[in-house]
Amino acid sequence: MSDFIFTSESVTEGHPDKICDQISDAVLDALLTEDPESRVACETVVNTGLCLLTGEITSKAKVDYIKLVRNVIKEIGYEGYRAGGFDANSCAVLVALDEQSPDISQGVNYADDVNDDLEDNTGAGDQGIMFGYACDETPELMPLPISLAHRLAIQLAKVRHEEVLNYLLPDGKTQVSIDYEKGLPVSINTILISTQHNPEIDGITNEEEIRQRIKEDLWTHVVIPATEDLKIKPNISKTRFLVNPTGKFVVGGPQGDAGLTGRKIIVDTYGGYARHGGGAFSGKDPTKVDRSAAYAARYVAKSIVKAKLAKKAEVQLSYAIGVAKPISILVETFDTGVISQANLTELIKEHFDLRPAAIIKEFNLRNLPKKMGGNFFRKTASYGHFGRRDLQLPWENVEEKAAKLEEASKIFL
């Protein structure tokens, strides 16, 4: 199918599930900052007036979890009259954390394929499959639908924080539908923005008048700035623009819906444009291959596309708990590759070390939280883990690796 419409969504940092992702990753940052060897599997639940922190943690670090949780909620914007019914200062915070199972830790500490190579000694923290993807639709080598959805969500949060639109509240979602012809993006079919807001705007209380005001403001202050540097731009007369289709969005955040860590895995990755192994990222230390190997798979896929060995690349990795080396490596280029997929797989095995300890070392994952002032993984917990123009993420830095791949591939041309 070469002509189609593809749709992806994003959510703001005030979405209930994203509150949870950010809290879980803030806990991870705090623990790794004090103890880089911390083992963390932290889950968060939010609901009306409640935040529950649970999971398994083994660490020498001492963290004031209640204070940390309240600070994250406050920084997102849920405080006082701007809280929209959920307040960092008054919500109950419950902490129910255990230590990591010794049966799991022994497999991570002492890999099944242990030998004299130290990086063979750290086994994968669980079994599983992970996918990485890249394509040449955008400068950051991401699919256009999810890239644009994130741009809109980031700009929506920005105009709220800066009080350009002072009636906005923290919860919000974006969705973008792109027209494709012959497999290439050609136009923006539909933009949908749902944003929480005050019940009254500058004296306006009529529901339809409020929605029209928000729609006009969002086009001017969110859509236009978020897309001004794109080759494909929205057209006010052709692009369908939907805002708060139910009519109003006053009750939101945890007051409106419960939130859980790990429920926005498609938002976190490629917007449904590529396959997903099912594992969430947030709240997991780097020994969990759900996270670290997914970063590595993106690194491999992006390197392939950057080296112009394919226009699209999807990489699947699989692991067994307690075993260092991947069980399997698969690359798919969707008939866009300049060399065979078998040759690409050979290059991957030669140029990428995909053992958990090697991935952790390559990206410095244990030490980045301290290096970044205690705030690294939390920044990835909203607006996507890949293709971030606003963050310096090591798995996105592929210039050197792509150059090596390009040179090495010449023997197959």
UniProtKB/Swiss-Prot annotation:
Top enzyme category: transferase
A Pfam family hit: S-AdoMet_synt_C
Subcellular location: Cytoplasm
Residues at which L-methionine binds: E56, Q100, D257, K288
UniProt keyword annotations, A-Z: ATP-binding, Cytoplasm, Magnesium, Metal-binding, Nucleotide-binding, One-carbon metabolism, Potassium, Transferase
Binding site for K(+): E43
Catalytic activity from the UniProt record: L-methionine + ATP + H2O = S-adenosyl-L-methionine + phosphate + diphosphate
InterPro entries, per the entry: ADOMET_SYNTHASE_CS, S-AdoMet_synt_C, S-AdoMet_synt_central, S-AdoMet_synt_N, S-AdoMet_synthetase, S-AdoMet_synthetase_sfam
Superkingdom per UniProt: Bacteria
SUPFAM superfamilies reported in the protein's UniProt record: S-adenosylmethionine synthetase (SSF55973)
Region listing for Flexible loop, in residue ranges: 100-110
EC number: 2.5.1.6
Subunit structure: Homotetramer; dimer of dimers.
Record family assignment: Belongs to the AdoMet synthase family.
Its job: Catalyzes the formation of S-adenosylmethionine (AdoMet) from methionine and ATP. The overall synthetic reaction is composed of two sequential steps, AdoMet formation and the subsequent tripolyphosphate hydrolysis which occurs prior to release of AdoMet from the enzyme.
Protein name: S-adenosylmethionine synthase
Organism this protein belongs to: Prochlorococcus marinus (strain MIT 9312)
Gene it is expressed from: metK
